[in-house]
Each structure stands twice: as C-alpha cells, then as structure tokens.
C-alpha cells in the first residue's frame, strides 16, 4: 500500500474513532428550538416545570437530571421528539414534533438537552 493510501486509511480510522463534535452553534440553535417547542411543558431550564406541564397528570421529563438522561441514547431522544411519547412507550402527552422539525433541528435539540444534563454524559460509556 502506498503512502497516500496509508494516510487516507489512517484519516478514515481516526475520523471514525473521534467522538462526534457538536458545535456551540448547534447547541445554541437547539436551545432556541427547545424554548420554542419544549419549554411550555419542560420549562425554560428543562426541569419539567413548564406552565403547561404542571397541569398534566404525568410530569414532563426533567432534562437536567443526568442520572436519568444519560441512560437514554441519542437515538431514543430523537425518536421521542420526532414520533411522540406514545410511539416509544412513554407518555402520550409528549407530542410528535417530526412534522414541524427536521432531523437536524431535532439533533440540535438533543445536543442542547445533553448540555443541560448534570452530570453530563461521558463518551465511551
């Protein structure tokens, strides 16, 4: 294998091994979307204490609780936001936002949720 091919292979492997980088811009956009679409139930700080959420028979998720949120995969969070709670075995009070939000927007919201969870999710676990 020549040098060019080796360098290409090393770059590919390094790219696959590196954790996915989430930009500050993605998180900032996620926060804007979160405030618009999620905060009514989950609260602006993400504690599940939004004005509409307080009147529900099931309390909305506290996105700041890292002990709980870190157990959920990004894929699961994407599904619950996109398809709604009932589609993933959770509360049917969680609406499906897949018709209003595209995949990038939902990914940005997940990125923002990850940023407010304490303790934060660590990679590789």
Q: Predicted regions: what is each one?
A:
Residues 30, 34-44, 94, 109, ...:
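The canonical Cys-X-X-Cys-His
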Residues 31, 47-78:
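Gly/Gly-Pro-rich "capping" loops immediately C-terminal to redox-active cysteine motifs
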Residues 18-33, 123-125:
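Electrostatic cytochrome c docking/interface patches
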Residues 26, 33-34, 73, 77, ...:
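Stable alpha-helical elements in mature extracytoplasmic
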Residues 8-18:
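Bacterial N-terminal signal peptides
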Residues 1-8:
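Positively charged n-region of N-terminal signal peptides that target proteins for export
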Residues 54-62, 80-116, 121-125:
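Axial heme c-ligation environment in periplasmic c-type cytochrome domains
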């Amino acid at each position: 294998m020549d040098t060019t091919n080796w360098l290409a292979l090393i770059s590919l492997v390094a790219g696959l091994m590196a954790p996915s980088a989430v930009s500050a811009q993605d998180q900032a956009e996620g926060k804007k979307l979160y405030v618009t679409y999620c905060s009514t139930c989950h609260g602006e700080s993400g504690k599940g204490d939004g004005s509409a959420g307080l009147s529900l028979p099931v309390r909305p998720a506290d996105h700041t609780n890292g002990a709980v949120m870190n157990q959920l995969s990004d894929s699961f969070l994407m599904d619950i936001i996109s398809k709604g709670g009932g589609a993933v075995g959770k509360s049917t009070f969680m609406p499906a936002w897949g018709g209003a939000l595209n995949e990038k927007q939902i990914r940005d919201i997940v990125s923002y949720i990850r940023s407010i969870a304490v303790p934060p999710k660590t990679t590789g676990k």
